[in-house]
Every structure is written in C-alpha cells, then in structure tokens.
Amino acid sequence: MLRVRGLSFSYPNGKLALVDFGLAVEAGELVVVLGGNGSGKTTLLRCITRTLRPNAGEIWLADTNLCSLEGEKLRRARLELAMISQHASLVRRSTVLTNVATGALGRHFGWRTALGGLPASELKAARGYLTDVGLTDLAEQRASMLSGGEAQRVAIARALAQRPRVLLADEPVASLDPEACQEIMRLLQRLARSEHLAVLCVLHQVELAYTYADRVIGIRDGRIAFDLPRGQVSREAVRRLYVGEAA
C-alpha cells in the first residue's frame, strides 16, 4: 500500500535528516517507528505527506508516486493519506460530531457547501465513525469538554471521515496518561485490521511498540537501523537508537 524508496532529505542549513530511507506498510498493518530526538521520524512523515519535498527518492501510494505529482493531482492524491499528531487540534466551540464530519472536507464536499451547513450524509457517516472509536454518546458535546484521550479519539474519527487508505500518526499518545495511551494504541491496531488501513505510527514509548506493532522500524541519524517483526526486535537494538541522547 505505502512504499518509500531511496528517500533523502536535507534542510537548508545542509543537515541531512533522511538518507536513502526505505519502508513498506501494507493494508491492515500497524508499523511503529522508534528513534531518538532529531533522528528523522517527523521529517519522514512530513516527506510522505509532501509537506516537505524530498531531495531524492520515491513515495508510492499503491501505483502512484507522490514525488512525481504537483498541484491539483498532488492535492487529490494526498486525500488518501490522513494524519494525526499528539495535539488533536479540534475546533473547541464546535460539537464532536461537527469536528468529525469536517474530515470529509475536500474529498466529498467543499467549503462552499460547508458554509451552508454540513451535508446530512456526512453527519450520518460521522456518527458511524464515532461509533468506531467508542464515542457515540458524545456526538453533541462541545469539543472543549473532552479529556485528552477523548479528543485524540475524535481526531482519529475525523481522520477516518476522510476515507484514507493510509493513516500516519506522529506521537499520537505523547501527552496522554498511561491508560489513555493503551486505549489509543488498541484503537489504532483494531482500525488497521477492521478498516484495512496501512498505519504508520511514530512513537517514543518503546513498550507500546512491543505490545501493539506488527513491525518496528528503528531510525538513527536519518537511516534505518532495523526493520523487523516486533518479536524479533531486541532490547539492545532499541537501546542503541537512543545512545547519546541527553538523559
């Protein structure tokens, strides 16, 4: 589903962030990326979404190379990718249901339609996505009233409303308590299976990777250190990813 080949990226100051990087994530699979601060994890996700333009390499979504697209073709292709981060970035004054329904903006309706009110079909679909994340009862509640874990589940439901084929998650549990962390990771694991999504998740929490990932990719200094099924990833290999980090 998602394949990255020979990806390299450097910042204007000349710092190499990614070097000949490659990975693959299949539909129904949850792959976790581990690495220290500044190792290139977030840069990788930003290159995959084409927020950053790689210096070299290919990013394949099914049979489409995103690196070969520009303009409207790129915009439409990017609708197949949904992104969540550690901050849910919800519209706090709007209801949970409205926040979820806006995930379909750009794919199923545009701003002109939205200004006249969200389509009934999308509101109905949004209720279904709230059911998927276990928040049906909070549909009419304002987003400002949500806990951190609830807000992140709403963000995931909003991503589902986009109808993506790939879900990218950048530190999705970084600001949550341990119970909420487990809840969100269980949800991502389940959705990968039930929605046939390719899920690529950047984490700092090593134990969550050992518990929920199908495969774990280690990244150090912009290069792949390992790419293995979680049961084959040694503690020593993970420790080496973080050697030299400030305690």
PLM regions and their residue ranges:
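ABC ATPase NBD coupling module
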Residues: 66-82, 112-120, 233
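Conserved catalytic motifs of ABC-family nucleotide-binding domains
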Residues: 163
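Conserved ABC ATPase "signature" region
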Residues: 65, 108, 113-137
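Catalytic Walker B motif of ABC-type/P-loop ATPase nucleotide-binding domains
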Residues: 167-170
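Helix-to-loop junction immediately C-terminal to a conserved catalytic motif
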Residues: 49
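Conserved ABC ATPase signature
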Residues: 142-146, 150
